[in-house]
């Protein structure tokens, strides 16, 4: 559960070997493969890899082009014996898959836009993820279920089946050209399917038996559903554009099997299941103790200011226990003078009068192109981190921290490029000596802030009001004291 990442739930008790950090789905089969391998054998060269139903598959990167060629030859061999027709084959290898993916993708995004408007947020890891999976899967499969009978009446089964896998081969080839290391994600399904279709085409089987055994190709394309499920679990539903195409690829391969008297019933079921998934996604709770809302309490204090501010950094609407607390509004304002990302859920508070961080200029002398500054920084409240935010006038500065060379780096993406920052972690009560060479010859006005994870008493009520279905994330609960400095 990556919902637990950087939260109090990020513990061994919640460890799942399938989703360790971001690539646990590959880590577990890799560990099994290594345990059964001869590790004394030398290995050179780049390899590409993929997890296949819990098994580890890898081959030299240079072999991908050969495997693509083998898959193409097998599909050609299958087409020689399978009734298809060149025109219909081309149609089902290009236009039909594109139509199914476009219709399904449009439907998915429209459904999730409606859900976001109703729920107020798209939750990456909701309490009941299966309801949202119902929406994604049914929306992507619905065009295939509705249009499948229409294709059956006009296009031979062989053209529908081979066309779908030629589309996947073309897609694999395109991925190989632009991102060769990503091609195995498709090739692990295309190659065994091409082999199966070629074998079925050349075996002396009755057409009915051949068509029946061809349904085994769905076992290969089901790998795409596996990929969609893993992406939703490890990256969250907010990466929706990376999830639904995998379900769409399964739909492209499955449309050939939408036929017979039951196809109309299947389409009707799909039409009914989609609104059912929508209703469940709207009415069931978005958060639970196992999959909580990410909500951190921030205390912000500008030195010598008459009042401080409280900020609730939350994904989505505030919990009822906190939404009614006085002073918080949905009006968006910048958190800091140097930031340029207005955020809601802020309120004025009585200042706890925490001591501000200190800065002492130990040296200030001119150098070629600017000035050399030696600064001594300190958190007067033993905070964990110091941040020095420099204005654009400092130019492309360089320097060192305790003798370690540093270069100018950009501030967070949430802050304007008019400022650059220097963050020093693990400070606590120590003096930090910084040497900077700036391009400015005149006075510089900067900001100095320190960050701790101990909230003052003024914020204790908010922390206590946070329900069990909400937890702090990333920085967690944070107290920031900042001041303007000139040197």
Segments predicted by a language model, with ranges:
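Soluble extramembrane regions of membrane proteins in the secretory/endomembrane system
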Residues: 1-58, 388, 392, 404, ...
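Short, surface-exposed, charge-dense and proline/glycine-enriched linear segments
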Residues: 4-10, 28-30, 34, 66-81, ...
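Sequence-level detector for tyrosine residue identity
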Residues: 5, 49, 53-56, 226, ...
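Generic structural signal for short, solvent-exposed loop/turn connectors between secondary structure elements
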Residues: 38-43, 81-86, 258-262, 368, ...
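Structured alpha-helical bundle/scaffold domains in large eukaryotic membrane-trafficking regulators
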Residues: 42-43, 64, 119
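Hydrophobic transmembrane alpha-helical segments in integral membrane proteins
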Residues: 57-70, 133
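Alpha-helical transmembrane segments of integral membrane proteins
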Residues: 69-359
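Extracytosolic and intramembrane catalytic regions of membrane-associated proteins
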Residues: 298-487
């Amino acid at each position: 559960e990556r919902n637990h990442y950087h939260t109090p739930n990020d513990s061994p008790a919640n460890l799942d070997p399938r989703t360790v950090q971001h690539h646990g789905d590959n880590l577990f089969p890799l560990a099994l493969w290594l345990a059964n391998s001869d590790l004394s054998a030398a290995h050179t060269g780049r390899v590409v890899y993929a997890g296949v139903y819990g098994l580890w598959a890898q081959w030299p990167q240079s072999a991908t082009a050969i495997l693509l060629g083998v898959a193409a030859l097998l599909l050609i061999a299958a087409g020689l014996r399978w009734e298809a027709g060149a025109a219909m084959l081309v149609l089902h290898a290009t236009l039909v898959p594109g139509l199914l993916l476009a219709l399904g993708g449009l439907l998915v995004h429209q459904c999730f836009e409606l859900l976001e408007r109703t729920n107020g947020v798209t939750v990456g890891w909701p309490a009941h993820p299966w309801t949202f999976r119902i929406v994604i899967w049914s929306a992507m499969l619905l065009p295939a279920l509705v249009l499948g009978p229409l294709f059956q009446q006009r296009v031979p089964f062989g053209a529908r089946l081979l066309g779908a896998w030629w589309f996947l081969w073309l897609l694999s080839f395109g991925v190989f050209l632009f991102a060769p290391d990503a091609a195995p994600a498709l090739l692990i399904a295309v190659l065994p399917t091409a082999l199966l279709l070629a074998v079925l085409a050349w075996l002396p089987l009755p057409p009915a038996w051949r068509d029946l055994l061809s349904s085994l190709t769905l076992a290969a394309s089901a790998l795409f559903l596996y990929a969609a499920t893993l992406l939703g679990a490890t990256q969250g539903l907010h990466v929706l554009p990376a999830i639904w195409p995998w379900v769409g690829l399964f739909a492209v391969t499955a449309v050939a099997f939408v036929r017979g008297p039951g196809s109309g019933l299947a389409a009707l079921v799909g039409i009914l299941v989609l609104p059912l998934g929508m209703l469940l996604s709207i009415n069931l709770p978005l958060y639970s103790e196992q999959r909580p809302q990410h909500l951190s309490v921030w205390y912000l204090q500008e030195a010598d200011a008459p009042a401080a501010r409280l900020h609730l950094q939350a994904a989505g609407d505030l919990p009822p226990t906190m939404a009614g607390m006085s002073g918080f509004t949905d009006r968006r304002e910048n958190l800091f003078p140097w930031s340029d990302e207005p955020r809601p859920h802020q309120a004025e508070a009585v200042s706890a009068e925490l001591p501000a961080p200190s800065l002492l200029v130990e040296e200030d002398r001119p150098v070629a192109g600017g000035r050399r500054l030696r600064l001594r920084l300190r958190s007067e409240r033993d905070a964990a981190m110091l941040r020095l935010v420099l204005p654009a006038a400092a130019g492309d500065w360089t320097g060192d921290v305790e003798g370690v060379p540093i270069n100018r780096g950009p501030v967070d993406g949430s802050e304007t490029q008019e400022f650059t920052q220097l963050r020093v972690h693990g400070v606590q009560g120590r003096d930090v000596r910084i040497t900077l060479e700036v391009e400015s010859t005149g006075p510089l006005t900067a900001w100095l802030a320190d960050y701790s994870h101990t909230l003052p008493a003024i914020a204790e009520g908010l922390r206590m009001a946070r329900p069990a279905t909400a937890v702090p994330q990333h920085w967690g609960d944070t107290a920031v004291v900042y001041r303007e400095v000139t040197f």
